[in-house]
Every structure is written in structure tokens, then in C-alpha cells.
């Protein structure tokens, strides 16, 4: 089942409300068990087609129910105003493809997630709150934020899945960002890109391969994949759920 409520992120949007979601295993009310938690971005796209931005969700609740996976998933919808999703889901300032400058507010978002949202989840649900049992995942800009979270908030997250991460936002600073980050030796990271996402100029593939190499050099336990016929879409990311769940040892 998926519970929904409203939250505020004062540092980003003041008292404006946005939806938060928590997937709970079907046996949650039947046991006293405590569960690992997977935090995710773009919560509105995860569970219900009717709420998904483009009419297709990840179908995540259906997958978890069908496979009886003992896991809590906690997520918040993005900011839908203008380019605010890009802003909140980027750790760095960048210029969008239309030439518009975007101010990176990703650190503020992660400070709220780790300082307010995670404590709320741990206090109100039967979680295993330690780092070993806490993971994070997302796609596109959420994939970029997953990489940022695992790199800069490693004391909270021992594992992450970055699907089709928007590495272009870092520009030429991508390698420097990875090299200056501190990863615990037990950090597990899944990262992929769809073969149909690569541009003709090869920039996306270069960024992906560069990030892969830098992460391996840092000693991260990395599983890196190019998904055959993969696209930048919820339908494509849904098909990767069994794979990254296995890599993150959440299944």
C-alpha cells in the first residue's frame, strides 16, 4: 500500500505544500518487523499512472507487491513550477539548453531530506534507520541527485541507483566532483544509461564513461550498464527495477 500526506520544505518553498509518499509492504500491519528504506526522487512518478507527469509511472508498488519485497519506499513529488525541478534536483548552477540559467539548490534539498524528512520517516514508521539499511535512487535529474547524495551524504546512504543521470549539469567539473568526494569502501552504486539516449555528438556517452571510470578509481562498488534500446522514460526505468534492486541487495 502507498500512504500519501503533505510536507513543507521551508528552505525551498516556504509553507507551500507538496505530496509525500510511503510505500509499505503488505504485511506491514501484520508484524512488528522493521524494514530498510529506499528514498527516491519524483515521488509522483513512482506508483500511479494517474499522477505521473507523462501518464506512465514506474509501477513500483505493483512490482514490490508481486515480489513481496520487505522494503519501505519514501519519496516526495518534485516542484512543478517552471524550472524549479531542475533547480532543486541540481547540486550545481548550470545553463539549461534554452540558455536560461538555473540555480542549483540540490544541497538545500538534501539537507532537508536528511535533516527533516528521513527523521520523520524513522520516527513514524518501523524502519531500520542505520546507513547499512538506507538507500537512495532516482532517474534523470533524480539520478544526478542520487550520485550527489551517495557522494556527499554518504554517512546516511550506503547504496544508490542513478538511472539515466543528468551528468551534463556538472559540465567539465564532473570528474573533479567525483575525485573530491569521500566514499566509504562499502558503498554500492548502480548507474545506467539507455542506448537510445546517447546523442550523435557522443557527449552523453563520454560523460557516462568518464563518470564510470572516475567512480571505479575512487573504489566505489559500481555496477555500470548501457541498457539496450533504453530510453529516457518511466517505462524504460521500470524495466530496470529488478536489476538495480538486486545490485543494491534490496530484493
Question: Which residues fall in each region the model found?
Answer:
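Non-catalytic cap/lid and distal C-terminal segments of serine-dependent acyl enzymes
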Residues: 1-251
Amino acid at each position: 500500500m502507498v500512504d500519501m500526506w503533505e510536507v513543507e520544505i521551508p528552505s525551498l518553498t516556504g509553507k507551500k505544500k507538496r505530496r509525500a509518499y510511503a510505500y509499505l509492504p503488505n504485511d506491514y500491519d501484520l508484524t512488528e518487523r522493521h524494514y530498510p528504506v529506499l528514498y527516491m526522487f519524483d515521488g509522483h512518478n513512482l506508483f500511479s499512472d494517474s499522477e505521473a507527469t507523462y501518464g506512465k509511472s514506474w509501477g513500483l508498488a505493483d512490482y514490490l507487491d508481486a515480489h513481496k519485497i520487505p522494503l519501505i519506499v519514501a519519496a516526495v513529488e518534485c516542484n512543478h513550477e517552471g524550472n524549479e525541478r531542475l533547480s532543486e534536483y541540481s547540486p550545481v548552477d548550470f545553463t539549461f539548453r534554452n540558455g536560461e540559467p538555473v540555480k542549483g539548490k540540490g544541497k538545500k534539498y538534501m539537507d532537508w531530506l536528511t535533516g527533516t524528512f528521513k527523521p520523520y520517516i524513522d520516527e513514524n514508521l518501523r524502519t531500520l534507520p542505520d546507513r547499512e539499511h538506507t538507500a537512495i535512487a532516482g532517474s534523470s535529474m533524480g539520478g544526478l541527485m542520487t550520485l550527489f547524495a551517495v557522494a556527499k551524504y554518504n554517512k546516511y546512504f550506503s547504496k544508490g541507483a542513478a538511472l539515466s543521470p543528468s551528468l551534463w549539469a556538472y559540465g567539465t567539473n564532473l570528474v573533479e566532483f567525483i575525485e573530491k568526494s569521500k566514499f566509504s569502501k562499502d558503498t554500492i552504486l548502480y548507474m545506467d544509461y539507455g542506448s537510445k539516449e546517447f546523442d550523435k555528438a557522443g557527449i552523453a556517452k563520454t560523460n557516462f564513461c568518464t563518470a564510470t571510470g572516475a567512480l571505479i578509481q575512487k573504489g566505489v562498488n559500481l555496477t555500470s550498464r548501457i541498457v539496450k534500446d533504453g530510453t529516457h522514460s518511466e517505462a524504460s526505468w521500470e524495466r530496470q527495477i529488478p536489476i538495480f534492486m538486486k545490485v543494491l541487495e534490496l530484493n
